[in-house]
Amino acid sequence: MNIQEEIKKRRTFAIISHPDAGKTTITEQLLYFGGEIREAGTVKGKKTGTFAKSDWMDIEKQRGISVTSSVMQFDYDGKRVNILDTPGHEDFSEDTYRTLMAVDAAVMVVDSAKGIEAQTKKLFEVVKHRGIPVFTFMNKLDRDGREPLDLLQELEEILGIASYPMNWPIGMGKAFEGLYDLYNQRLELYKGDERFASLEDGDKLFGSNPFYEQVKDDIELLNEAGNEFSEEAILAGELTPVFFGSALTNFGVQTFLETFLKFAPEPHGHKKTDGEIVDPYDKDFSGFVFKIQANMDPRHRDRIAFVRIVSGEFERGMSVNLPRTGKGAKLSNVTQFMAESRENVTNAVAGDIIGVYDTGTYQVGDTLTVGKNKFEFEPLPTFTPEIFMKVSAKNVMKQKSFHKGIEQLVQEGAVQLYKNYQTGEYMLGAVGQLQFEVFKHRMEGEYNAEVVMNPMGKKTVRWIKPEDLDERMSSSRNILAKDRFDQPVFLFENDFALRWFADKYPDVELEEKM
């Protein structure tokens, strides 16, 4: 195997969107073209019992939303495609944020009837901060939506990114006739037996259609006043190519996939803590754990650490360093994914995502290296939780299951765990309410441990250095606790309590996470 050639083939990207914009449906269609599934199931399959391939966890199937990031891989057109499907629900920003650290590009799915929505904006900010390319898919053209020019304007005004339309819709909703493909210089037809026609046939096909006249006017306007196409600007994350289509009816998706693969970047390097960048073509293997997922196979109560390979080649059975602990590990039981199904892998290269069977060795953010290399990659972001719950086992006899469940789910990073310094009570912190619901559901469903959860409301959280800690600092306005790494942390009732504490102890440094 020529490793350099293999690395060049890799295209690793995440799909981001607001809930219900059609992210899971487009993922399905891409897998369909990759030959991974025989028919694209859609999330609407709640009534029929056919669930989307990427929404594999029980609670996702019930709700029709993605709450974990799943990884899928397929080959298409000489490229090895790795898709990371991110949670579309706003409460799962931490997991999503980390996933976006492991990709080289992002596909942003927008509901053409709703335009840019809150969660899309939030996720886009993360992608923009990383400076990776964004490809936009304006979805649901089979329904009535906003004017295409207005949608492009929203990209520029709300997200602050220039856009270039790769194709243009001819009509919408019931009047939808197809796409005027500017990049490939052809028409893509929504109805009839023929899929494509030449631009010269446009007047013959749509001559009397008022929408087609509008399309020609719009394109003339774009040619005169629109942005210029620039591959350089796309790769720099300064220009987003825009594709129109309908994931549900599988229209425009294959054209999108083929064009995307032409312009999406090869695997990029990753920054170490000393600021140096590790090149994907370095011969030495390196990677980082961006996610840990328990119970991908509930029958075996397993846990998988998801690793983005940054450089070199993984070979089954290889020994790696874990600089965080100073110890080593052997990578013998390693898999690659198709949502819930997986297969053992013997080789993988930079750009690939592998799953390492984990018995408690790894943490999110861990760096893996080989040989004398003991460096670490820059730390992954963590979020400061905003709402808290006290949590305990409903049945004292189930304490063992309770502790195992908490330990595993907390290591995934979906909730954060704190322990009251004085009472030893467990407290959970989260960004949003849904995280608690998912935690409770999974504790009961996967660990057979019913839990009692009591709301503590919102808190303002600050970490302090262990050497600054004095237990007398604890008062009725705060709770002194330890996080899961045994670091001291204060949970303040409100901002007033925080300011009061800061005034009383001016020499104590209070640290806030992201």
From Swiss-Prot:
| SUPFAM superfamilies in the record | EF-G C-terminal domain-like (SSF54980), P-loop containing nucleoside triphosphate hydrolases (SSF52540), Translation proteins (SSF50447)
Q: Where does GTP bind?
A: 17-24, 85-89, 139-142
* One cellular component (GO) term of this entry: cytosol
Gene3D superfamilies (UniProt xref): P-loop containing nucleotide triphosphate hydrolases, Peptide chain release factor 3, domain III, Translation factors
Annotated keywords? Cytoplasm, GTP-binding, Nucleotide-binding, Protein biosynthesis
Annotated Pfam families = EF-G_D2, GTP_EFTU, RF3_C
Specify the tr-type G domain's residue ranges: 8-268
One annotated GO biological process: regulation of translational termination
Q: Which domain of life is it from?
A: Bacteria
The subcellular localization recorded is: Cytoplasm
- Record keyword Cell membrane present: no
One MF annotation (Gene Ontology) recorded for this entry: GTP binding
Described function: Increases the formation of ribosomal termination complexes and stimulates activities of RF-1 and RF-2. It binds guanine nucleotides and has strong preference for UGA stop codons. It may interact directly with the ribosome. The stimulation of RF-1 and RF-2 is significantly reduced by GTP and GDP, but not by GMP.
The Swiss-Prot or TrEMBL record describes its family as follows: Belongs to the TRAFAC class translation factor GTPase superfamily. Classic translation factor GTPase family. PrfC subfamily.
Q: Which HAMAP family match?
A: Rel_fac_3
The name of this protein is: Peptide chain release factor 3
Q: Which organism is it from?
A: Streptococcus pneumoniae serotype 4 (strain ATCC BAA-334 / TIGR4)
Q: State which gene encodes it.
A: prfC
